[in-house]
């Protein structure tokens, strides 16, 4: 009979209680911060539109923003990329000053007339405020990662009024093709609480309505197939434009950094260019958040070039170093692009605007599930099918690129494009591999041989960790012992987070450790003393570093190091029949 300590549901209760409390506090912080941000942006936008002469001072605003970050905020200047990098490779608590600095910088951008959004600001405020709980609660390792994800979800949900999409966004944005479910509960709680708190502060979100939604039923083959093909075509266009936005923004940023050595001068020069451009086009519809134009895209026909103009203004603003988010401009670009596509596609204007609204955002952020859920939250369930098709297609067409350079590639978007797992978007081009077609001439396609410069490497090492099935992470207090995870779950996760190339937990039928009694798995109740073997494959230096870093977690583990080499192709003697 199982003991109480072995019942999974019982073990889950302390974790649920723990993260319910932490995520609620994080949600309150995120909701309050987002309310302050939204109220500040509304004031800045109204003041700017009533005093258009302030746009002429955009270079001055850029210089001030650049000076503040250069002398006070250097450690947090990376913004969202710092958050993602800290989740993947935790080093130190996000400085508290990230929150007030990004709030001030974003308000200055909108006050003086830059084109930016608010999502990046909300994410940075939410995550940095939530991360301050790390010091109070002494959170480490995976708990701190979950806390940062919780702050991201709370910030996203509260600033856009989409709690379900916000919860999924915090899980999905970390890596392309993979979702971290370990933070699902806390992200969901923080998203719901954050949205609720923002509303309680008296903040109201924009209401988007779709005029009509046609049927995609294939029972009416001509009408249904036309709608389906239109959604696919629109999704492809949305993905390509999202790719263009991401690459243009990064390219402009690279040009400014390579040509202007003193960072504060970059937003000053960029601000001068934007101010001149606003004067040249004779309208302010392409700066700021652009909410009125987004709303118009659902109801009236707009000039077909609006999306391109907003793309250019936003890419220049963010590339020059102004602070603010990318997502609301992506909403603008997508909605106006969908509006333009209604001139050639047999779908309602409002529906295409809604599809573009979420499609361009989802593909630029590489978060298709969050964007689909957002469409359902904002536009209603009937829009889900069209949004789903366009978001998935746009995600595929945007390639391995995106607005977050620190985002990792967890799984290639295309079966015949092989990418090393864990590579960031910033380094993706140098890690792209050509697919192999001949299994017998090159078994590297199965991952058996690690290649370097076209030649097999012979320096891999196997680290075998032996422990009992019932062994758990060492805990000093009764509470720690009660909530400690089992080693057979904890150690593979540590290996994955540390970046170990390969980890395999072998299933053991029978055995014993260090002269203990012989135990066997009789498939009813697994004996606590049954041996477990976790085998890690990587370079010896990496494995030794793993043991050093996690020595406290390996107290009950017998460690065996086996030096070996990769077997090159010519030694395998494989012949095709």
Regions flagged by a language model, labelled:
Residues 1-437:
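Alpha-helical transmembrane segments and immediately membrane-proximal extracytoplasmic
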Residues 436-577:
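Positively charged, small/polar-rich N-terminal and surface patches that mediate targeting and assembly
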């Amino acid at each position: 009979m199982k003991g109480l300590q072995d019942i999974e549901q019982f073990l889950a209760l302390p974790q649920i209680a723990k993260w319910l409390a932490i995520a609620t506090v994080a949600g309150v912080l995120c909701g309050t911060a987002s309310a302050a941000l939204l109220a500040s942006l509304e004031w800045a936008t109204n003041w700017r539109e009533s005093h258009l002469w302030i746009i002429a001072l955009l270079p001055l605003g850029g210089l001030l923003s650049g000076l503040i970050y250069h002398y006070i905020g250097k450690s947090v200047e990376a913004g969202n990329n710092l958050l993602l990098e800290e989740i993947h490779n935790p080093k130190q608590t996000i400085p508290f000053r990230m929150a007030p600095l990004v709030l001030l910088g974003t308000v200055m951008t909108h006050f003086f007339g830059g084109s930016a959004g608010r999502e990046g600001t909300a994410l940075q405020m939410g995550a940095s405020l939530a991360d301050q709980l790390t010091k109070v609660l002494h959170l480490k390792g995976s708990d701190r990662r979950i806390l940062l994800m919780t702050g991201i979800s709370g910030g996203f949900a509260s600033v856009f009024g989409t709690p379900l999409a916000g919860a999924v966004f915090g899980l999905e944005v970390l890596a392309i093709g993979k979702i971290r479910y370990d933070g699902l509960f806390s992200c969901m709680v923080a998203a719901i609480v954050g949205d609720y708190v923002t509303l309680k502060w008296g903040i109201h979100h924009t209401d988007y309505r779709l005029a009509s939604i046609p049927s995609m039923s294939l029972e009416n083959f001509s009408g249904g197939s036309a709608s389906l093909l239109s959604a696919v075509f629109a999704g492809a266009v949305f993905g390509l434009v999202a790719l263009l936005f991401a690459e243009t923004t990064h390219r402009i940023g690279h040009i400014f950094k390579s040509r202007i050595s003193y960072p504060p001068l970059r937003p000053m020069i960029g601000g001068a260019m934007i101010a001149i451009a606003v004067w040249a086009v004779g309208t302010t519809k392409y700066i700021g958040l652009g909410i009125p134009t987004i709303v118009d895209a659902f109801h009236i026909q707009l000039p077909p070039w609006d999306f391109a103009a907003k793309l250019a203004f936003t890419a220049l603003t963010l590339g020059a170093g102004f602070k603010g988010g990318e997502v609301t401009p992506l909403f603008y670009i997508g909605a106006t692009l969908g509006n333009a596509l209604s001139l050639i596609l047999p779908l309602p204007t409002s529906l295409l605007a809604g599809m573009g609204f979420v499609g361009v955002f989802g593909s630029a952020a590489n978060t298709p599930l969050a964007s689909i859920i957002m469409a359902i939250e904002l536009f209603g369930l009937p829009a889900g099918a069209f949004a789903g098709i366009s978001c998935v297609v746009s995600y595929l067409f945007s390639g391995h690129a995106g607005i977050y350079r620190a985002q990792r590639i967890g799984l290639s978007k295309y079966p015949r494009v092989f990418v090393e797992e864990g590579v960031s978007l910033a380094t993706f081009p140098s890690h792209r591999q050509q697919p192999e077609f001949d299994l017998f001439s090159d078994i590297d396609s199965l991952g058996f041989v690690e290649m370097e410069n076209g030649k097999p490497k012979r320096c891999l090492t196997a680290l075998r960790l032996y422990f009992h099935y019932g062994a758990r992470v060492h805990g000093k207090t009764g509470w720690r012992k009660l909530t400690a995870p089992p080693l057979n779950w904890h150690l593979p996760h540590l290996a994955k987070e540390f970046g170990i190339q390969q980890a395999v937990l072998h299933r053991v039928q029978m055995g014993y450790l260090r002269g203990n009694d012989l135990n066997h798995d009789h498939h009813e109740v697994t004996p606590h003393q049954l041996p477990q073997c976790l085998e890690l494959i990587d370079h010896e230096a990496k494995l030794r570093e793993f043991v050093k870093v996690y020595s406290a977690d390996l107290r009950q583990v017998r460690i065996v190091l086996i030096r070996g080499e990769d077997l090159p192709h010519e030694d395998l003697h494989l012949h095709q029949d």
